[in-house]
Amino acid sequence: TIETSKDNAEGANACAAWRFADGTTTVNLRYGISFISEEQAEKNLHRELKDYNIKALAEAGRQIWNETLGRIQVEGGTEDDKTVFYSSFYRTFERPICMSEDGRYFSAFDGKVHEDNGTPFYTDDWIWDTYRAAHPLRTLIDQQKEEDIIASYLRMAEQMGNMWMPTFPEVTGDTRRMNSNHAVATVADALAKGLKVDTAKAYEACRKGIEEKTLAPWSGAPAGWLDNFYRENGYIPALRVDEPENDPNVHPFEKRQPVAVTLGTSYDQWCLSRIAQALNKKEEAEYYLKCSYNYRNLYNKETAFFHPKDKEGQWIEPFDYRFPGGMGAREYYGENNGWVYRWDVPHLSLIHISEPTRPY
């Protein structure tokens, strides 16, 4: 039923409908969006879409994208190669998104509207997916934006009240998707390249995110049994077939992902050691550097794969590195199998732990 007497709608499933005269072929429609208020949405509309000149708007957008993508000039290769490169480069700007609106922003991390004090607030950064390449690229082509993104992480940590670095910040808050705490890698990389970071605050947030929050994938719960086991033994234990789960922090579908979490956390702790070193925290830097070698605890020299162990320290056998652990190999890895996770450790380190007689 369409209620023609109303000119507004509210609610999660709110919608609007329009009727047009017969023969109408073109409709001009503008709309404003705001996470703050209706008044702010109207201001955003008039600032961003002053009129219905679609051609002028498209040309302005084209110029912005040409300037943005023109930061990298490609020589050589074919036109197809350039198309692939610039299409991929374009997608690195998909996220994170800037939430600031005229100097204010809504944060789902505490449900409040804040002043940004001149520093844009970014979110919707799927860090598990972006820390390896997108963030390092940004440190080379847009250092100011990378600094603002990391500053946004620290605001999130403060706003959540626990000072835990976010792991998967979205518009709706930190959804804690995937595994590990790879925001620490963005901080370590930024410091290594001379970017401006509140190092002390970043270290606190990264350390607490790793130590106080559970390492169980897809969870924002406090550290529990699995975390204590990892600290004492240097790896996340795997369950044997039909062995019941005993840690309530473990997601029933996402499972423990023990190899993925062990390898990912080892890298996170190496990054944390670099930040501690930058702060001249020598003992903590040495401690986390030692922890960073935990990936070796799951390296099976006989097979040259990273292999899950049970809580007694025994390899899970028999084992198929191609199709292990159910949907997405989550019972042992995380959305990849043993062959892919073989390369999760930097290659020079793999060479060091491989048998010298085995070809690399």
Feature map (PLM): residue ranges:
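Acidic/polar, glycine-enriched structural segments that form the non-catalytic walls/loops
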Residues: T1-F121, R155, A200-L215
